[in-house]
Amino acid sequence: MVNVAPTLLCVHAHPDDEALFTAGISSHYGDLGYRVVLITCTNGQLGLDDHGRPGSDPLHNVEVTRATRAAELQRAAIVAGFSRVVTLGYDDSGMRGWPQNDSPDAFMNADVGCVARTLAAVMDEVDVSVVVTYDENGFYGHPDHVTANVVTRAAMELAASPKRLYYPIAPKAVLEEFVAGAKAKGVFLPAWILEADHGVSDDTVSTTMDVRAFAKRKHQAIATHVSQVDNADLVTMDEELFTLLFGIEYYQLAWSRDVTSGDETDLFGGL
């Protein structure tokens, strides 16, 4: 009988989320020989365009942004250790309150059952053991992140192979220390950090992944999404600050098929 490598699946909303939130674990498990798969739900066409204009700007170039972000995603995924990338192609919904929220093609308006069936099919095809996506608040409230949680939870009920579901989270103490240090050094902080509701309590953390050995790779993955200049200061800030935020990844166990839990330093522990 041939032993098949365990599979990690990360479900993300936009191109660059895979670099910002989970590039540490994807690099770690990829280097261990695990199969690491990425599903990106939207094309990110409302991100910053080639002139740095957000999707809310009437002059924003949607077509250029869509193509640019697709290319950046493929390059960054390789850096971050993903062996396969699945893109669902839904439109970016934009931040809450943007007019694009009303588009029938926006991910937040997608049919949950339809998306869940697509995700479940991928989960079982790759025989996934561990799935990672955002918590119910989408980490910082973005509609597409919230929708990613909803459809992933629905897919877990349909798929036979997943054994665990984790959420990437930021402990309150870590986030506050980072934000204070960044502000003291004049670092521009993007919305996904400033609007993360001040982090979560320490007792929410079930698994702590020390990925400092992959900090440079995570830095490179973030930098690969060069069009998203709102993250530029994260790329240029000093190593100490970068490692404080990105050197340790924290996860909350949201669901487990078996009552047996893993250890506190391995998402696959005990499987």
Residue ranges of each PLM-predicted region?
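Active-site rim/loop-helix segments in enzyme catalytic domains that contact anionic ligands
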Residues: 1-126, 154, 158, 242, ...
